[in-house]
Regions:
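Short acidic, Pro/Gly- and aromatic-enriched capping/linker segments at domain boundaries
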Residues: 2-15
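Short loop/turn motifs at secondary-structure junctions and domain boundaries
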Residues: 3-6, 49, 68, 85
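A short glycine-rich, His/Asp/Glu-containing loop-to-beta-strand
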Residues: 15-67, 128-137
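Short, conserved beta-strand element in jelly-roll/cupin
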Residues: 59-61, 70-86
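Short beta-strand segments in beta-sandwich/barrel cores
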Residues: 66, 83-87, 101
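Short acidic-glycine-tyrosine-enriched beta hairpin
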Residues: 90-108
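A short hydrophobic beta-strand segment most commonly corresponding to one strand
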Residues: 103-140
């Protein structure tokens, strides 16, 4: 078993000092080797988080596009199947699929000079996008 914790990268849509949205790539919280249950071999895991407000599964049809908007709350978006993209006001377009986690954290975004606010997003390809949405409490550190 590996002696060093694996590196996991997360995609973070947030706001910069000017209130406009930017895309960052951040490391996941630190993981330690720990047991997860009696008789189960230990695994690399981050500390459990107790900041979940709600969760749901969404299915977005091929061709769906959200238009420019803010996230309704701080939320994790985790694709189960299909692919999608997110574009922030800084012009960065990030494509994601299963195995990639995205933290939508642009609830305080302000309009840019063209009136766009927050981010735009859409489904890639001819398959529906199925995502798990985990909405967080407003004051959680994620």
């Amino acid at each position: 078993m590996a002696e060093t914790a694996p590196t996991v990268e997360l995609i973070h849509v947030t706001t910069g000092p000017d209130g406009l949205t930017v895309t960052e790539r951040l490391p996941a919280p630190e993981m330690t080797m720990r047991p997860v249950g009696q008789g189960i071999p230990p695994i690399w895991a981050s500390d459990p988080q107790a900041d979940v407000q709600s969760w749901s599964i969404w299915t977005l049809p091929p061709g769906w596009r959200g238009g420019w908007h803010r996230n309704p709350s701080r939320q994790w978006v985790m694709p189960i199947s299909g692919r999608w993209w997110v574009e922030t006001q800084d012009g960065v377009r990030t494509e994601m699929g299963p195995g990639e986690a995205h933290l939508g954290d642009d609830t305080n975004a302000v309009p840019d000079s063209t009136g766009r606010v927050g981010h735009d997003s859409g489904v890639i390809g001819d398959e529906p996008l199925v995502v798990m949405i985990v909405q967080l409490d407003d004051h959680s550190p994620a």
